[in-house]
């Protein structure tokens, strides 16, 4: 009888303790959420991390960047010193979220710092022109991906953002088009070979030997001929396609990326064909076999600007982030965004 009473007393005591501690737990949780909202902001876009480039509309981005340069604001908005600091702080919070979306947190710090400068350049360029900002990873998504490593990863990104505070890439006093991609074909591309009217002399070829041995460098796809033709007809509904031989690569740039491809007598852009068939890059070859069509693609991404894989290798060799950026963006300089 005494044992039962003792057991019942312990149960009541445990229940009372839980009731008393519950408000404390809820308050602590709410404070944590409020703190994260204060640190991160609430305007993040739910995204999934990929070491890819913003390629869904690369031509549109390039054209928009050129228009941005033509319409630079003659007068800057006047703010107080406090107002400017608040604005800069808000931008730096966005940079952390953008970088979390654009590159793996396991990369060397100097590689991440280089990505911070790229992200800040593209963000300020978009803000100045009033165009779409780079995609951000929300705090909730960060917690989901990083799990128990959340605090460690957050602090690593935060230190990289702070180490490059306010730094952007400039050419002739304006923001550059800071293109980047995951893995090149073995060298990056000259922008002038794809768009002759693109005034981007800083986007020129850089050797990336390390990319040729990177995981994900080589992709091989096999299609049944019927399947291949169906995919091509879906992408080019006006083309009268009856056999794979009607698709022929016409030209490549110096980095071996396809620039022009003939589809049933009509010529199209290599990047357009790449996206239509969901290939990892426009550095590809097409081979018709007995009953199949084989496509071999090299690299991941459009191949312009910084190769994240080679940037990682350069960091391992001792390059700092400034040297990494100089390697990929010839003639561009690092400046402070607030000085424009």
Question: Positions of the model-derived regions?
Answer:
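N-terminal, intrinsically disordered, polar/charged segments of Gram-positive cell-envelope systems
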Residues: 33-89
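Sec-exported extracytoplasmic/periplasmic mature domains
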Residues: 100-104, 117-128, 233-237, 315-319, ...
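Hydrophobic membrane-insertion alpha-helices, especially the h-region
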Residues: 14-30
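Zymogen propeptides
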Residues: 92-109
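N-terminal Lys/Arg-rich, disordered targeting/topogenic segments
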Residues: 1-11
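C-terminal soluble interaction/assembly domains
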Residues: 271-340
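Extended substrate/cofactor- or partner-recognition/assembly subdomains adjacent to catalytic sites
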Residues: 92, 109, 116, 121-293, ...
